[in-house]
Regions:
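Short, conserved loop/helix-junction motifs that constitute active-site signature segments
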Residues: 77-82, 117, 142-144
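Rossmann-fold NAD(P)-binding glycine/threonine-rich loop
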Residues: 89-140
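NAD(P)+-binding Rossmann beta1-loop-alpha1 motif at the extreme N-terminus of oxidoreductases
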Residues: 1-43
Length: 210
């Protein structure tokens, strides 16, 4: 599969390594048009390339967006049309500035991203795990129920299945928290699943209790 990765920070670079290691072709982008990614691309080998943001979005059948939430409106929306987009962002007011609709609980960050990327098949995911845990805790040798959980949410069931397959290929278990709105709220900063080291069995128990 071809995967575009928007953002080369901790989550983006780690995910790119894992996707390439699982045999996928990866285009990694940053705000500098791919400049400065030479060492990462060399590490990933022939399955990876450095690109600009729009090129990475057009390249990927799946696109992982791992940039600060406050920059979401700078994404070239047309390039994401029809793509399965995994939004790994979280809203941090101290970093992103205040968004009244989020502060008032009217909507969620991923719903705002989805409204900007019209035509994209958006899934919330990869936002509740530290990058070091993403790097270290995947294990394809474990049964799914014993693997570290990565939570996903979305309104497009087919897109969620695609995201879940990628999660499983890199050694984790996808745990569905529901539709983009309700499910996204269950993944927000400070919730019972945010950055908690839960396997899939434990995650299901926590979600059912909530």
């Amino acid at each position: 599969m071809k995967i575009g990765v928007i953002g080369s920070g901790n989550i983006g670079a780690t995910a790119a390594r894992l996707f390439a290691g699982a045999g996928h072709e990866v285009a990694v982008s940053n705000s500098r048009g791919g400049a400065g990614l030479e060492s990462l691309i060399a590490e990933l080998g022939g399955r990876a390339r450095a690109t600009g943001i729009e090129e990475a979005a057009r390249f990927g059948e799946v696109v992982l967006v791992a940039v600060p939430f406050g920059k979401y409106e700078t994404l070239p929306a047309e390039a994401f049309g029809g793509k399965v987009v995994i939004d790994a962002g979280n809203y941090y007011p101290q970093r992103d500035g205040n968004f009244a609709r989020l502060d008032g609980g009217e909507t969620t960050s991923s719903e705002l991203v989805a409204s900007h990327l019209k035509g994209a098949r958006l899934v919330k995911g990869f936002n509740t795990i530290w990058s070091e845990h993403l790097k270290q805790q995947g294990d394809t040798g474990l049964p799914l129920e014993e693997r570290r959980a990565i939570f996903i949410a979305g309104d497009d069931e087919g897109a969620k299945r695609t995201a879940a397959r990628l999660v499983e290929e890199i050694g984790f278990a996808a745990v569905d928290t529901g539709p983009l709105g309700e499910g996204g709220r269950r993944q927000q900063v400070g919730t019972a699943v945010y950055n908690k080291e839960l396997n899939a069995r434990e995650a299901a128990r926590v979600l059912s209790a909530g």
